Curated annotation (Swiss-Prot):
Record bears the keyword Metal-binding: yes
Highest taxon above the source species: Eukaryota
Pfam families: Meth_synt_1, Meth_synt_2
Catalytic activity: 5-methyltetrahydropteroyltri-L-glutamate + L-homocysteine = tetrahydropteroyltri-L-glutamate + L-methionine
Annotated positions binding 5-methyltetrahydropteroyltri-L-glutamate: 18, 116, 495, 518, 521-522, 567
Protein name per the record: 5-methyltetrahydropteroyltriglutamate--homocysteine methyltransferase 2
Pathway where it operates: Amino-acid biosynthesis; L-methionine biosynthesis via de novo pathway; L-methionine from L-homocysteine (MetE route): step 1/1
Cofactor binding comment, as recorded: Binds 2 Zn(2+) ions per subunit.
Length: 765
């Protein structure tokens, strides 16, 4: 029985690639140094899979930045601003596309489906000249072969590539990206022919777009593309791989009748309905690559349950045509549990990172072939049993509180307009009130203080003194700038999710559980393993301390339940929404303690609310209902005069505007500066919004300092579609990553612009 891995993390068990990339970008090491680290990582990955007994080992899933950008390089589809003309694309052009350079900006980056990984979006149009400009896929296949490892080269499929692209600037909106298929397929043919000539017997084409809601003409594009490739593919075994969701019935029909294809890969973890499609009809003589090991989470597989699923499929496709696989690339999970020396032993026994998932895939394949590793299966069953019965997982009082939520929609009893009146009486704010989103710059010195306190190198007394001094500095800066609603700057926080997770029960933290987000940037998601509760107040001390330093309103700053959920590895033994409600109840306790502590403005960030939106439209309303309900649970118990803010960190939310209104926050601030028109068009089209709203007036992701006139112009554009009595003036995100030399003049320009418009409106402060 054969085994297969869809893809593997690139960063290395201790983020070796991250440090090699950043050293190269900083000019501290050479291209040769970077290539050496990369080659060593690839070699280790291939040898590890080979030693584990994996039959179909992927190559070309390694990348210096992103696999879609690698495909853009392969096709020579470099936007003209990067100065590439012909030949082989080098690292300078490649990294300029990814990161920009001194004279040109980077290409756009966006989320890879509903994961926390991001890809570089190709910019395409009728003028793009395609050419075979990166031989990476062939080179890496040959590199593995030279090490004695036979691999399956992986390419992003041609139709998914085009559907993941965007129109280049200036291209007519009516242009159909799929009309470029005849231009890119010749390059695919060249690559495939070279791989065949180099000795490849299998090739994997990733076509994840098959799981989306696609119109008929898009499905036809797949049929046409593979018919065109058929003669080039002949003599090869061809796997078309899909992942991240169920495949719709119509798409399944199209996929399983593609010409020139010998195998089909499916995510059977998130795509359980796909199992029914397979059982109701699978093409005879074709291979099924069954993704039963979860590539997106860190839990040990239920081997016995997976084996039952696989055995039921064996009868449909035949013993020699069933291949055990991962649900998607292991890129989306952590690298290796072996590096977790400090993690609690019981919790550790419940986990499997990428390296362990490779072993699970092999164990399942062997068990299917009648060679069960009894001790491995027994240890797995024991770990699952311990997880089910552990008192650390179940907290009865949390279960009761969550069960009691049923039957209420947790809305505040008073309408938002009356609440805003009560808040204005208390806060006495000018029109166009100014505020910031929460964090202030985190200096080297501040990070040192936090690090030393964590390592017990300085006392708690010294730590508290240092943080109080930092808060005082931030308060004084805001008062000097004449900002209306202040923040404490969050100097005590390293990360907006980890900070809360460390203080909530039911969370565990890894030392090396890093996952690539984009380029060299990695995130280390907390692990939610049990029922979530709040043992004691988390932020009240710091917020009250900050409020005591000023007469102006001080915002309490919390991360919302949906964002905590979407940025964590979440337990898989109960529905996600149940875990979210538990987090919401913990945040509710904190909100009420902040209110008791004299904090009259409380911000509950939901930066990642849209990120959790399912891929398929049919599933949107259920997700949005429980996500919005979770937010309302957090603040349904406060007085009318307590002002609840939320912040959202993305621009493209026009399709969920009604859910955002349904959150019933008093004020919403939104990352907007890069897409003014998109956001304002919603209100221009007549969406009625009566609560406070603060679309970001300048982009904090850039070091550029905006002028007063520029911000005033932005405010005027907003006033054209929004009432002056609900508009707030704020940057579009937190200021944590900026320097004080950038922040002070930018905030001054913002406050001056607000005052200028106030005076023009005849309502000077």
């Amino acid at each position: 029985m054969a085994s297969h891995i869809v893809g593997y993390p690139r960063m290395g068990p201790k983020r070796e690639l991250k440090f090699a990339l950043e050293s190269f970008w900083d000019g501290k090491s050479s291209a040769d140094d970077l290539q050496k680290v990369s080659a060593d990582l690839r070699s280790d990955i291939w040898k590890q899979m080979s030693a584990a007994g994996i039959k179909y080992i992927p190559s070309n899933t390694f990348s210096h930045y992103d696999q879609v950008l690698d495909t853009t390089a392969m096709l020579g589809a470099v936007p003209s601003r990067y100065g590439f003309t012909s030949g082989e694309i080098g690292l300078d052009v490649y990294f300029s596309m990814a990161r920009g350079n001194a004279s040109v900006p980077a290409m756009e980056m966006t989320k890879w489906f509903d994961t926390n990984y991001h890809y570089i979006v190709p910019e395409l149009g009728p003028e793009v000249k395609f050419s075979y400009a990166s031989h990476k896929a062939v080179n890496e296949y040959k590199e593995a072969k030279a090490l004695g490892v036979e691999t399956v080269p992986v390419l992003v499929g041609p139709v998914s590539y085009l559907l993941l692209s965007k129109l280049a600037k200036g291209v007519d909106k009516s242009f159909d990206l799929l009309s470029l298929l005849p231009k890119i397929l010749p390059v695919y043919k060249e690559v495939i022919a070279e791989l065949k000539a180099a000795g490849a017997s299998w090739i994997q084409l990733d076509e994840p777009l098959f799981v989306m809601d696609l119109e008929g003409h898009k499905l036809q594009a797949f049929s046409g593309a593979y018919a065109e490739l058929e003669s080039t593919l002949s003599g090869l075994n061809v796997l078309v791989e899909t992942y991240f969701a169920d495949i719709p019935a119509e798409a399944y029909k199209t996929l399983t009748s593609l010409k020139g294809v010998t195998a089909f890969g499916f995510d059977l973890v998130r795509g359980t309905k796909t199992i029914d499609l397979i059982k109701s009809g699978f093409p005879q003589g074709k291979y099924l690559f069954a993704g039963v090991v979860d590539g997106r989470n860190i839990w040990a597989n239920d081997l016995a349950a997976s084996l039952i699923t696989l055995q039921s499929l064996e009868g449909v496709v035949g013993k020699d045509k069933l291949v055990v696989s991962t649900s998607c690339s292991l890129l989306h999970t952590a690298v290796d549990l072996i590096n977790e020396t400090k993690l609690d032993a019981e919790i550790k026994s419940w986990l499997a990172f990428a390296a362990q998932k490779v072993v699970e895939v092999d164990a399942l394949a062997k068990a299917l072939a009648g060679q069960t590793n009894e001790s491995f299966f027994t240890a797995n069953a024991d770990a699952l049993s311990s997880r089910r019965s552990s008192p650390r997982v179940t907290n009865e009082s949390v279960q009761k509180a969550a069960a009691a939520l049923k039957g209420s929609d947790h809305r505040r009893t008073t309408e938002v307009s009356a609440r805003l009146d009560a808040q204005q009486k208390k806060l006495n704010l000018p029109i166009l009130p100014t505020t910031t989103i929460g964090s202030f710059p985190q200096t080297v010195e501040l990070r040192r203080v936090r690090r030393e306190y964590k390592a017990k190198k300085i006392s708690e007394e010294d730590y508290v003194k240092a943080i109080k001094e930092e808060i005082k500095k931030v308060v004084d800066i805001q008062e000097d700038l004449d900002i209306d609603v202040l923040v404490h700057g969050e100097p005590e926080r390293n990360d907006m999710v980890e900070y809360f997770g460390e203080q909530l029960s039911g969370f565990a933290f890894t030392a090396n559980g890093w996952v690539q987000s984009y380029g060299s940037r990695c995130v280390k998601p907390p692990v939610i393993y049990g029922d979530v509760s709040r043992p004691k107040p988390m932020t009240v001390f710091w917020s009250s301390t900050a409020q005591s330093m000023t007469k102006r309103p001080m915002k309490g700053m919390l991360t919302g339940p949906v964002t905590i959920l979407n940025w964590s590895f979440v337990r898989n033994d109960q529905p996600r929404h149940e875990t979210c409600y538990q987090i919401a109840l913990a945040i509710k306790d904190e909100v009420e303690d902040l209110e008791k502590g004299g904090i009259g403005v409380i911000q509950i960030d939901e930066a990642a609310l849209r990120e959790g939106l399912p891929l398929r439209k049919a599933e949107h309303s259920f997700y949005l209902d429980w996500a919005v309900h979770s937010f309302r649970i957090t603040n349904c118990g406060v007085q009318d005069s307590t002002q609840i803010h939320t912040h959202m960190c993305y621009s493209n939310f026009n399709d969920i505007i009604h859910s955002i209104i349904d959150m019933d926050a008093d004020v919403i601030t939104i990352e907007n500066s890069r897409s003014d028109e998109k956001l304002l068009s919603v209100f221009r089209e007549g969406v009625k919004y009566g609560a406070g709203i603060g679309p970001g007036v300048y982009d904090i992701h850039s070091p550029r300092i905006p002028s007063t006139d520029e911000i005033a112009d932005r405010i005027n554009k907003m006033l054209a579609v929004l009432e002056q009595n609900i508009l707030w003036v704020n940057p579009d995100c937190g200021l944590k990553t900026r320097k004080y030399t950038e922040v002070k003049p930018a905030l001054k320009a913002m406050v001056d612009a607000a005052k200028l418009i106030r005076s023009q409106l005849g309502s000077a402060k």
